[in-house]
From Swiss-Prot:
Protein's recorded name: High frequency lysogenization protein HflD homolog
Family listed: Belongs to the HflD family.
Lineage summary: Bacteria, Pseudomonadati, Pseudomonadota, Gammaproteobacteria, Vibrionales
InterPro entries per UniProt: HflD (IPR007451), HflD-like_sf (IPR035932)
HAMAP family: HflD_protein
């Protein structure tokens, strides 16, 4: 993995995309399906050729790049995005310090990879299996991420599964972000450069 601005922007957009999708589901009970599929597939891509390969291509990160450019601001929605991002980074840091959890995470992801040989990854049961990895491996590490949205929507089991699966995808991108040199300080001091890079990528779509 190269430690370039491009790589950090791609990894950060992956985090942003997972967060934007969590917001969509938590509020409305549905989300951009193409972006959702990209984010969930990224969890299972554990041996990528490069940073972009985790997600496929740049256009598959359009929602995340747009969130990076326009979504992180002082509005209530923007503040929520920032809160989710900081929470994901904090969880990733705790995860990295726990060899037992990392080993368990790897085993559980491999199990889902094997299941995809027989089942569609986007069947409800498979999304539930991905969500259970977050619930069993990531949640106990803490701190818990408080998801805000429409209560009646969040009470639906299928939406809870999608949200947890997306939070796991956010962790996947947070791990990638650290691998390519991303640090929490970049959220404050390096974001302008990432926004400029994201704008270039969006302009050529």
């Amino acid at each position: 993995m190269a430690n370039t601005l491009y790589d950090r922007t791609i990894a950060f957009a992956g985090m942003c995309q997972a967060v934007a999708l969590v917001q969509q589901i938590a509020r409305n009970g549905h989300c951009d399906q193409d972006a959702f599929e990209t984010s969930i597939k990224a969890i299972l891509n554990t041996n990528p050729a490069n940073t972009l390969d985790v997600f496929g291509n740049e256009s598959q990160l359009k929602l995340g790049l747009e969130c990076l450019v326009k979504g992180i601001d002082s509005t209530p929605t923007g503040s929520e995005v920032t809160r989710y991002l900081i929470s994901l980074m904090a969880l990733e840091r705790k995860l990295m310090g726990r060899n037992d959890a990392m080993s368990q995470l790897g085993d559980r992801i491999q199990m889902v990879q094997r299941q995809t040989e027989h089942y569609d990854l986007f069947e409800e049961q498979m999304i539930s299996n991905v969500a259970s990895i977050y619930l069993d491996v990531i949640s106990p590490i803490g701190p818990r991420i408080q998801v805000t949205g429409t209560p009646t929507v969040l009470q639906q089991t299928s939406n809870q599964h999608k949200v947890r699966a997306l939070l796991l995808s956010g962790i996947r991108s947070a791990v990638l972000w650290r691998q390519v040199g991303g640090r929490r300080r970049h959220l404050i001091f390096g974001r302008k450069k990432m926004v400029e890079q994201a704008q270039i990528l969006l302009a050529r779509m």
